[in-house]
Regions:
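Conserved nucleotidyltransferase catalytic core and NTase-mimicking acidic/glycine-rich helix/loop elements
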Residues: 151-357
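Short glycine- and acidic-rich boundary segments immediately preceding or forming the N-terminal edge
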Residues: 1-24
Length: 357
């Protein structure tokens, strides 16, 4: 695991990251055991957990976000299946001290694969649809049978790679960055930033401080891991991309397998730790992961979470807990900027060329 390798290199131990990972793995095992009793045996359905549990950053008090992904024919039994799974998950969540998915979010129900794969962009690509698709790619774990998840992810990546305007032209590119995929990841990051402002208004400020800190930390980490996946196509896998996309016959399956194995089925912390090991400076890595460890330590404190949930917007400037977390997020941001724009010249060039315009 890359985070352990980075800890060893730096001679540090990030206890909050370690504890959250152990708790997450315990929760996934408990869920897997409970779902096995539900006899979720069809290859057309996969139970998927997302969010902090999929990132292996789950702590007591976190939301247990999940969805039943259906990749097959419509069946009236899908509704009772999802209801039974909901009851099972809620029982496990109660045992672990986890919360139900937000009723205003896209989780806690079933989703069909058709729009997730076919509606990328355009009017049919709703906020919910985009969220499910990008989180499937960046922070999802299958519980039990995962054939449906694997098929859907493969088809999503096929669309991004085979319909990329530059790759589809058959003309070799100067760089092997999958811009279609990268643009959708960037779009999602900007969407959740805008939605933060929208939710503060809609909910009259309820829970805004907790969402603010998560946006500064865990949401940003997820976004970084997606950008690194796209940039690594040029920095680490260019030769394989050229062979598969611009050879005698286009064949994206080896590329998809690579992306699934090294990125989609890894969590954001490990993806970022691996990148820091390969091309980051020691001091930048220390600042980045120290800040993230502090964030997870604070999120594991129920009194802190409760305070952030209840904090009034107008009182935030005088609240020491929120201001400390905000200052910590500035250290995290500073390290992220150094990593992308100072530590490595090739990464700096890609960030300047692809991440803004």
């Amino acid at each position: 695991m890359s985070i352990e390798g980075l800890q060893a290199k730096l001679g540090l131990e990030w206890n909050a990251i370690k504890e959250a990972r152990a708790f997450s793995q315990k929760a996934v095992m408990q869920l897997s055991s409970a779902i096995e009793r539900e006899r979720l045996k069809s290859s057309e359905t996969s139970l998927i957990v997302l969010g902090s549990l999929a990132r292996e950053e789950c702590v007591p008090g976190s939301d247990l976000d999940w969805t039943v992904l259906i990749d097959g024919r419509v069946d009236p039994q899908h509704v009772p299946l999802a209801q039974n799974i909901r009851d099972t998950i809620q029982a496990v969540a109660a045992e672990l001290g986890l919360q139900k998915p937000s009723p205003r979010g896209p989780f806690g129900d079933m989703v069909f694969s058709h729009d997730v794969v076919h509606a990328i962009g355009g009017e049919d690509d709703t906020n919910r649809n985009t969220t499910i698709r990008i989180l499937l790619l960046l922070e999802s774990v299958g519980i039990g049978k995962s054939e449906a998840r694997q098929r859907v992810l493969t088809n999503i990546l096929r669309r991004y790679l085979e319909e990329d305007a530059y790759f589809a032209s058959g003309i070799p590119k100067s760089r092997a960055v999958p811009r279609f995929l990268l643009n959708d990841i960037i779009r999602y990051w900007r969407t959740i930033a805008v939605d933060f402002a929208s939710k503060r208004r809609e909910l009259a400020g309820e829970g805004w401080a907790l969402r603010n800190i998560k946006l500064r930390m865990s949401r940003k980490l997820m976004f970084m891991s997606g950008v690194l996946m796209c940039f690594d196509c040029e920095m680490k896998h260019r030769e394989q991309f050229e062979k598969c996309l611009f050879g005698p016959e286009t064949n994206t399956l080896p590329l998809i397998e690579l992306l699934l194995t090294d990125y989609v089925n890894c969590n954001p912390l490990d993806i970022c730790a691996r990148a820091f090991l390969e091309r980051g400076k020691t001091e930048t890595a220390r600042e980045f992961f120290n800040a993230y460890d502090i964030f997870l330590s604070e999120m594991s404190d129920e009194s802190v979470r409760s305070r952030l949930k209840e904090l009034d917007y107008n009182a935030a400037s005088d609240d020491s807990e929120f201001q400390n977390l905000r200052t910590n997020s500035h250290a995290f941001q500073k390290a992220a900027l150094s990593f992308f724009f100072s530590d490595n010249e090739q990464l700096k060039a890609l960030s300047q060329e692809y991440a803004l315009f």
